[in-house]
Amino acid sequence: MAAKNVVVIGTQWGDEGKGKIVDWLTDRAQGVVRFQGGHNAGHTLVVGGKKTVLHLIPSGILRDNVTCYIGNGVVLAPDALLKEMDMLEAAGVDVASRLKISEACPLIMPHHVALDQAREIAKGAGKIGTTGRGIGPAYEDKVARRALRLQDLFHRERFAAKLGEVLDHHNFMLKNYYKVEVVSFNQTLDGMMAMAERLKPMVADVPRSLYEANKAGGNLLFEGAQGTLLDIDHGTYPFVTSSNCTAGGAATGSGVGPSAMHYVLGITKAYTTRVGSGPFPTELFDDVGQYLGEKGHEFGATTGRQRRCGWFDAAALKRSIQINGVSGLCVTKLDVLDGLETVRVCVGYKIDGEACDILPVGAESITNVEPIYEDLPGWSDTTVGVQMFDKLPQKAQTYLKRMEELCEVPVDVVSTGPDRVETIVRRHPYEA
């Protein structure tokens, strides 16, 4: 049978529940690929009631026979990776023999973290709300063609020469502009070299490995981090992350051609959340917003920050569906809406008195939009753990069907709880 590749993408501002869905889909995949972002992602998996949070290693690591890949589009913090490996291996998960890392990954280093944190402090109230982990500065170095890549780590003299140049540049900024302490060359060099030996066995030609896996009939799963509305090009710029979190990023960030992406699964919550700064048209500041946050346990897996909550935004989802070429939707956290008398859906916006049915481009265009709502009846029966669509409360079914009508894409999967088994499958992505 020919191999099939599925891309999992967040369609909102991240935190849509991708980790659980990737973990569930790995049942059908022989390889799972991270293709963008860094250890700013927080993917929470619950298996048999046991909770694991992964930041860098693909969620497929919890399945014994799955090979995990970190593609060239990921910025790699070696210390964070080794810490995560140690945590998993202490829990009995074999990582080292099942993880392949692209030699082209740019490295996140101490000067990137120092810059990230100094900038956020300097911006004060105008801050973007980064995780302070050096992600943005590492991507900047990549684009400026001065990044140190994983392959450089195994050549001490080459690494030292490049590091000297890069530190001259960044330390000048840290000292003279941000007025903070500079980063030590010797400490950085010794620290990075100390990690090289453990990393070396996992370094691979990832594009070739993925090509060979497909050729041998293996299904691949591409695991997106963050969400479409945080994409550097298509998100609510400048309140965005520094990578392409859209389906197109799966191709560039892994070295697998776009024609090999056979199905794109867009993950969306049954409501909307956002972490950090930036426009959010359907944000709620009332008791309902509080209720969604508490019932949905809306605290970031990476930062612990409380997420902002609001109604489901079909106009924003429509933008994500078009950008990603979404084949089908997976709706998560439906149970959080259980018990609400009325459920509101944003179907468009008023902008300067004119109606618009799709999210405008860029933060400035979105800041003053007025959402246009459609009210749907809520349901009182629980949806928790339901595994058949027709066993959902009738009004919950109506809500999901309305979502399909508004977005013109089928709801193929519904998540009704954090565990793998709490899933309704209407059309399986690997069978679609």
UniProtKB/Swiss-Prot annotation:
Entries under SMART domains matching the protein: Adenylsucc_synt
Pfam family, one: Adenylsucc_synt
Keywords from the named record: Cytoplasm, GTP-binding, Ligase, Magnesium, Metal-binding, Nucleotide-binding, Purine biosynthesis
Localization annotation: Cytoplasm
Keyword match Transmembrane: no
Catalytic site: D15, H43
Keyword Nucleotide-binding recorded: yes
Record's subunit section: Homodimer.
Protein name: Adenylosuccinate synthetase
Source organism of this protein record: Thiobacillus denitrificans (strain ATCC 25259 / T1)
